[in-house]
Each structure stands twice: as structure tokens, then as C-alpha cells.
A protein has these predicted regions:
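A subset of solvent-exposed loop/turn segments in beta-rich extracellular surface proteins, enriched
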Residues: 21-27, 43-44, 63, 71-87, ...
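Histidine-acidic residue clusters that define the catalytic metal-binding segment
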Residues: 90-92
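General secondary-structure edge motif
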Residues: 34-35, 87-88, 140-141, 190
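Short acidic, glycine/proline-rich loop/turn micro-motifs
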Residues: 34-39, 78-80, 130-132, 183-185
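Short, solvent-exposed secondary-structure boundary motifs
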Residues: 3, 44, 96-98
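Predominantly transmembrane beta-strands of Gram-negative outer membrane beta-barrel pores used
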Residues: 1-42, 49-57, 65-69
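Face-selective signature of the C-terminal outer-membrane beta-barrel domain
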Residues: 55-73, 94-207
């Protein structure tokens, strides 16, 4: 099914894959950049996102679900616009770009009043900010900000759920690993000009 809205166009669908599997998906693409440009705004946002789900029923007791989500945000500057207020905003607003996705799989087994689930997932976020003095990208000497930050997390979880009359008992274990990196270059102008240039790398394990 295709949809057309005031700020986006979308596509979605669902159905069967053979006798044991079903699928569901949707995707959206905005055209906000065109609308914001017509309105004379100094920033032009745009996004694309999509999601998909597949469920496979191996038997009455066993099933597998796979889920994926993804998105891209991209905001660029409308340097064609003039005016004191617009030029002030353009002087400090950076260009932003962000990509993110999450993918996971969950296997579930039903055993009477009990159900066991094992889930594996991974998420990713990439954030980038860039700014040039006077929005002039013709020379790296004009670069005042370049930020690159990436966050990732991988998780493995096992769980048992038991229905005991009026009570539900749930127990489980989880292991996760998170990884973060940041590379930042910043040139600033105050009483004395200077630069800030650093890298960060961090890994965390949790359970």
C-alpha cells in the first residue's frame, strides 16, 4: 500500500512466505527539504525510515521472529536565503547527519504453562555534525566543527516465563556489550583562537 501525506510518502505491505512464515514491512521518505525551502527556512531536514518483521512458525511449540528497524536523518543548510535573522542562524547551525539501525532475532519455545525465549539483538547509531566558517566548504581551513560519534550495543538474553494460576513467574539472564567512539575537532574564536581535537573509545560489558 502506498500513502501520500503532507510531508512524506510511504509504502507498506504484509503477506505470507510459504505456509509457515509471514512478513510485514513499511518505509517512509519525507520531502520536508522541499517544503522548508519553499517557506524560506534556513535549515532543510529530511528523513528516511523503514521497518520489517518476519515470523516463522516451525510448529505449534516453536517460532522465530526477526525484526529490523533503520533510519536516516539528514539536515542541510539553506544558504540561498538572505536576511539578518536567517544569516545569524546559518552562522552557528551545523549540518547534521544521523544513521541508526536495530536488528534482532527471537526464538520462542512453548511448553505447556511455560515459555522459553532466546533473543539476540544489535543496535547502531552514527551521528555526524559538521560546520564551516561562513558555510564555505571550499577549504578545510574554514572547518570549525567535525564530530563523529558511534554507539553500538549487542545483547543476548534468555528468559523463562511460567504461568502458575493467578501468578506469572519470569526469570532470565542477559549479557550485553556496548561500544562508543567519538572523534571531535573544534576550532573556536574568542579572545584567543584555539582548537580542540580529541578521540574517545569506550567499551562496557554488562550482565
Amino acid at each position: 500500500k502506498a500513502t501520500l501525506g503532507a510531508s512524506e510518502v510511504g509504502l507498506s505491505g504484509s503477506g505470507h512466505i510459504g505456509e509457515k512464515a509471514t512478513f510485514l514491512f513499511s518505509a517512509r521518505q519525507s520531502y520536508l527539504q522541499m517544503l522548508f525551502k519553499l517557506l524560506g527556512l534556513p535549515f532543510l531536514p529530511n528523513y528516511i525510515d523503514a521497518q520489517a518483521k518476519v515470523r516463522i512458525r516451525f510448529s505449534q511449540r516453536d517460532e522465530l521472529t526477526v525484526l529490523a528497524l533503520a533510519g536516516i536523518d539528514n539536515m542541510r543548510l539553506n544558504t540561498d536565503e538572505k536576511g539578518e535573522e536567517t544569516e545569524y542562524l546559518l552562522s552557528y547551525l551545523p549540518r547534521l547527519r544521523q544513521e541508526t539501525f536495530t536488528v534482532g532475532a527471537s526464538y520462542r519455545h512453548y511448553a505447556g504453562r511455560h515459555a522459553q525465549t532466546v533473543t539476540l539483538s544489535h543496535s547502531y547509531l552514527n551521528n555526524r555534525n559538521t560546520k564551516y566558517l561562513g558555510n564555505d566548504e571550499s577549504s578545510e581551513d574554514n572547518l570549525t566543527l567535525r564530530l563523529r560519534a558511534v554507539e553500538q550495543k549487542t545483547s543476548l538474553r534468555a528468559e523463562n516465563r511460567s504461568h502458575l494460576g493467578r501468578w506469572t513467574l519470569r526469570e532470565g539472564v542477559e549479557l550485553s556489550y556496548s561500544h562508543y567512539t567519538n572523534r571531535t575537532f573544534r576550532r573556536f574564536f574568542a579572545e584567543q583562537a584555539g582548537t580542540l581535537n580529541y578521540r574517545t573509545r569506550l567499551g562496557l560489558t554488562g550482565w
